[in-house]
Amino acid sequence: MEPFVSRIYFGDLLAGTDEAGRGPLAGEVVAAAVILDPAQPITGLADSKKLSEKKREALFVEIQEKALAYGIARATIEEIDELNILHASMLAMSRAVALLSIEPEYVLVDGNRIPPNLPCSAEAVVKGDARHAAISAASILAKVTRDRDIVQVAQIYPEYGFEKHKGYPTALHLEAIRLHGITPIHRRSFGPVKKILEG
């Protein structure tokens, strides 16, 4: 895939932001923002979904060690149900950018929409997690954090198998919902959950 190069911003204080967890039926949506250090390049950055769990975990540590700044934020299950998943994802990305210890001069956002309330100009990059290192780094921080969150939840609700499906609507997960009902971490606005609630 063609690497992305902004034709608007050419400086170094560029943040990438991405989210993880738009598709699952359960759990919060997690976003991250990263400003990479050009003096400390990180090899192996790619779309987090294309990397093995082991590789993601290693890069998760390296990104935090080498980045000039990073922020990780969430939108709650209540916010997802109230706003919808798209707006909740935008909110989480805005929060992640706001948590950066260095204010960016420009933000690259994975996808085709720009979150509101960013502190600077921004550009949306379709498939950005595979095309720009800063967005790739953000996608890795977001995915590893969300996966860790959901594995912790699995200890509270062991009968749902969250550690296996991470909250996605797999046959295993849907069967667990059918057998055991809805938990407080399920997104009530999502089709399969809504259907069960409506009986």
From Swiss-Prot:
CDD domains: RNase_HII_bacteria_HII_like. Keywords: Cytoplasm, Endonuclease, Hydrolase, Manganese, Metal-binding, Nuclease. Residues 12-199 form the RNase H type-2 domain. One of its GO terms (biological process) is mismatch repair. The keyword ATP-binding does not apply. GO terms for cellular component: cytoplasm; ribonuclease H2 complex. A divalent metal cation binds at D18, E19, D110. Its EC number is 3.1.26.4. It catalyses: Endonucleolytic cleavage to 5'-phosphomonoester. It is found in: Cytoplasm. The keyword Transferase does not apply. GO terms for molecular function: manganese ion binding; RNA binding; RNA-DNA hybrid ribonuclease activity. InterPro entries: RNase_HII (IPR022898), RNase_HII/HIII (IPR001352), RNase_HII/HIII_dom (IPR024567), RNaseH-like_sf (IPR012337), RNaseH_sf (IPR036397). Coiled coil: none annotated. Its cofactor is Mn(2+); Mg(2+). Manganese or magnesium. Binds 1 divalent metal ion per monomer in the absence of substrate. May bind a second metal ion after substrate binding. HAMAP family: RNase_HII_B. Belongs to the RNase HII family. Endonuclease that specifically degrades the RNA of RNA-DNA hybrids. This is Ribonuclease HII. It comes from Marinomonas sp. (strain MWYL1). The lineage of its organism: Bacteria, Pseudomonadati, Pseudomonadota, Gammaproteobacteria, Oceanospirillales. The gene is rnhB.
